[in-house]
């Protein structure tokens, strides 16, 4: 079970320690790397991210990670901003407020500011997630289980959506596009349900 090569991609824009500990608690060894050989020989990959999409894509470019991530053929899980980076574009502009940020384009989604009505931004704290029946990422996780969110931008619900959440309006809580998976919430901060989701991903 634990002989897999598990790699957290070293994006330079995330505190990876909590993700690393969450994986290690399940009995897996984890490597943090941006080395192409290590990344492409991994059995499972994690793409965490914090900050803005523009900063994160700049970091990926500086580290020669954009094409590398696109070459991955094994399951990859983007977490929070890491999920958003899988989309085509993001409205989260960072320094330049007049243009969309081009993302990795691995999933046919565009990241937009949450339309929350009267609810405050960021969307921060525990909220329920409703997953599509039968997706292995949510195996044995109860419908309406709570996960922990911290974000102001999200993908709208679309064909790529495998789970959704509602905060004023529905948004995508998890995506899948081929071998690329993403979760908007933080599974490493989401108690037993989050640990189960990480375990499900590692067992894909």
From Swiss-Prot:
Keyword Cytoplasm assigned: yes
Record keywords, A-Z: Amino-acid biosynthesis, Cytoplasm, Glutamine amidotransferase, Histidine biosynthesis, Hydrolase, Lyase
Major location category of this protein: cytoplasm
Active site feature: 80 (nucleophile), 186, 188
GO biological process terms, semicolon-separated: L-histidine biosynthetic process
Intracellular or extracellular location(s): Cytoplasm
SUPFAM superfamilies for the chain: Class I glutamine amidotransferase-like (SSF52317)
InterPro entries attached to this UniProt entry: Class_I_gatase-like (IPR029062), GATASE (IPR017926), Imidazole-glycPsynth_HisH (IPR010139)
Keyword Lipoprotein: no
One Pfam family, short name: GATase
UniProt-recorded Gene Ontology molecular function terms: glutaminase activity; imidazoleglycerol-phosphate synthase activity; lyase activity
Pathway: Amino-acid biosynthesis; L-histidine biosynthesis; L-histidine from 5-phospho-alpha-D-ribose 1-diphosphate: step 5/9
Residue ranges constituting the Glutamine amidotransferase type-1 domain according to the UniProt record: 5-204
Reactions mediated catalytically: 5-[(5-phospho-1-deoxy-D-ribulos-1-ylimino)methylamino]-1-(5-phospho-beta-D-ribosyl)imidazole-4-carboxamide + L-glutamine = D-erythro-1-(imidazol-4-yl)glycerol 3-phosphate + 5-amino-1-(5-phospho-beta-D-ribosyl)imidazole-4-carboxamide + L-glutamate + H(+); L-glutamine + H2O = L-glutamate + NH4(+)
The enzyme's E.C. designation: 4.3.2.10, 3.5.1.2
GO cellular component entries: cytoplasm
Self-association and partners: Heterodimer of HisH and HisF.
Protein role: IGPS catalyzes the conversion of PRFAR and glutamine to IGP, AICAR and glutamate. The HisH subunit catalyzes the hydrolysis of glutamine to glutamate and ammonia as part of the synthesis of IGP and AICAR. The resulting ammonia molecule is channeled to the active site of HisF.
Name assigned to this protein: Imidazole glycerol phosphate synthase subunit HisH
UniProt gene name: hisH
